[in-house]
Amino acid sequence: AIYSASKRIEHYLTVENDAIDVDTLGTRQLGDMTIEVIDPVSDYAELMQTLFDFDCIHSLINSGLFRMRFDAMHAVTGPYARDIFEQRLGVTPDTLMNAEPSEDFGGGHPDPNLVYAKELVDVLYAGNAPDFGAASDGDGDRNMILGHRCFVTPSDSLAVLAANAHLTPGYRQGLAGIARSMPTSQAADRVADKLGIALFETPTGWKFFGNLLDAGKA
């Protein structure tokens, strides 16, 4: 829907004004338009609390029976991880790795795979390894999931998440459908078939997933 609307734009208007201070929360006036500066970290964390059972996860994390690591790779997800995992779920400080965003990603490459997230991989394959590990990329839309000395391929993690989504409060009624890009394996297809829901294969690109999300199909 958004993509279709963008193709109908015929002109746009500009207005001269002082720069908006995006570091200060609150509302500002720009001509006849009101601009509100929000805290996306807080808003995102509050949304996640409606989708997942934070009380249950908090109990697991603080039971002494489960340990995890998350590598933000010095990218955008660091502040989100601190808010959710540290402040709301109560993980220990050493749970989060590379959680401070850096313009050069700490000199690394924020691609969550076995090569560039080697620091996390080494932890998960060590003698006293945690039970769960994850890393996310530069803008937080791709991830790598690890178990205790176990690597989960991204296509399989999509299938596992889809198969178990009904166990979370936000998706208790089930999924409308599953979408995957063409390079992704067909593991998710098997889940969709088992659940009796639609499976959409798209070209690579968020605009294709966005259209399905806007239409309520995935």
Where are these regions (language model features)?
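Short glycine-aspartate micro-motif
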Residues: 69, 131-135
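Short acidic-glycine loop/turn motifs at beta-strand connectors
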Residues: 137-138, 147-149
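Proline/glycine-rich low-complexity loops and linkers
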Residues: 4-42, 148-218
